[in-house]
């Protein structure tokens, strides 16, 4: 086990918790998911994910490391419903479609995204990130609407704090 990668996971989980608690303290959502946040990304400690992630982020990015990371990422998104990719259905007859994400996973997903803003200290960073990445995200229309409503509420609250 790599000390660097273990520390990264711990720090990421702490920042996800910070993001979630900020949302909760500012009344951004009514639903609370405390227990869910406490087990956020626990699959990163599994055999299927830990070593491939560690090698990818802290080792040499050989073709083999990249391939193992790809399988680890696939494992991660298939075992963590806070990732939008978990809710994308691909089938032979209908092609690709997004299923609506339950609100608890949307809240966790936004907390996950926002964790990186908490790490950098720029809480506004999430808005540029979302704008840059939203076209690649396959979201059900109701999920996208909820995501954007929550992001709008976050921005409004941040703006109040600045004023």
Please describe what each predicted stretch is.
Residues 1-163:
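Metal-dependent phosphohydrolase cores
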């Amino acid at each position: 086990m790599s000390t660097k990668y273990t520390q990264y996971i711990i720090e990421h989980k702490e920042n996800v918790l910070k993001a979630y608690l900020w949302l909760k303290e500012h009344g951004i959502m009514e639903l609370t998911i405390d227990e869910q946040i406490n087990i956020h990304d626990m699959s990163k400690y599994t055999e299927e994910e830990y070593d491939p992630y560690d090698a990818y982020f802290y080792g040499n990015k050989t073709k083999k490391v990249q391939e193992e990371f790809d399988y680890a990422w696939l494992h991660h998104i298939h075992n963590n419903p806070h990732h939008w990719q978990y809710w994308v259905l691909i089938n032979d007859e209908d092609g690709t479609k997004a299923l609506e994400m339950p609100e608890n996973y949307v809240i966790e997903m936004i907390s996950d995204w926002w964790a990186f803003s908490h790490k950098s200290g720029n809480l506004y960073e999430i808005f540029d990130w979302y704008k840059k990445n939203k076209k690649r995200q396959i979201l059900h229309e109701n999920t996208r609407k909820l995501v954007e409503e929550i992001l709008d509420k976050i921005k409004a609250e941040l703006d109040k704090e600045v004023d």
